[in-house]
Amino acid sequence: MAPPPKKPRRTAERILEVTLELFNRFGEPNVSTTLISAELKISPGNLYYHYPAKDELINSLFTRYEEALGQLLHAADDVRNVEDAWLFFHMLFELIWQYRFLYRDLNDLLSKNRKLETQFQAVLKNKSHAVQGVLDGLSRGNAIHIASREAEPVATAMVVVLTYWLSYEYVRDPRRALEPESAGAALMRGAFHVLSLLMPYLDTASREHLLKLVGTYQN
C-alpha cells in the first residue's frame, strides 16, 4: 500500500510569513531567530530544521520578492498614458511596501549577504529596463515628448526614487513611516514623485490628468 501523500510544508510557509512581518516591523538587523521562534511558538530547533541560518530566511523572502517583481515589471509594456503609468508605479510601490525591510535596511543587507549583493544589481537593471519601457510607451501614446538623450538619465532618476523612497519616508518619521497605517499616503507620495520627474515632458492634458489623479487619491 502506497504511503499517504505528504502534507504541505505549512510550518515552513508560516515561518516565512511571520519572519516577513517581523522584518518589516522592526528591521531585519533587530530580529533574531530566537525572536522568530518565540513569535511562532515553536522551538529554535524546529526553526533550524526548516531554515538553518537567518540568511536562508532572507534569501527565501528575497526570491519571492524577485519573482513577484519580475511578473509585475512585464506590465510596463502595456503603459500608453499617464493613468496607466500611475497604476503601474502604484502597484510597484505596493510590492516594495510588502517587502519593505529589503529597502529599509538595503545597505546593511548588501554588505553582509552575497546573494543580495549580486541579485539586487539584477533587480535594478530590470527596474531600469521597465521604466524605460514606460517612457517608450508614453512616447508612443504621445503623452510625453522627450529626446532620446534625456530619456536615460530621467529613467535612472525614476529608479533611484523607486529604490530609496521608503528610506526617505523613514528618515522623515522614523516612528511611524513604515507602519501599516502609513502605507496609503507613503505609496501615493512615492508614485507621484516618480511621475513628477516626467512633468517637463508631459503634454498639457496628461499633466493635468496626473494632478487630478493625485488629488483623487489624496481625497
Predicted regions and their residues:
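N-terminal positioning helix adjacent to the helix-turn-helix/winged-helix DNA-binding module
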Residues: 4, 11-18, 154
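Helix-turn-helix
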Residues: 14, 22-60
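Short, basic, alpha-helical segments at the C-terminal edge of helix-turn-helix-like DNA-binding modules
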Residues: 63-69
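Secondary-structure edge/capping motif, primarily at the C-terminal ends of alpha-helices
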Residues: 73-77, 103-110, 138-142, 169-176
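Hydrophobic alpha-helical connector segments
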Residues: 74-101, 155
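Amphipathic alpha-helical segments used for helix-helix packing
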Residues: 96-118, 132-136
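Amphipathic alpha-helical packing segments from all-alpha helical-bundle domains
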Residues: 115-141, 152-167, 185-200
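C-terminal peripheral helix-coil segments that are non-catalytic and often amphipathic
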Residues: 167-219
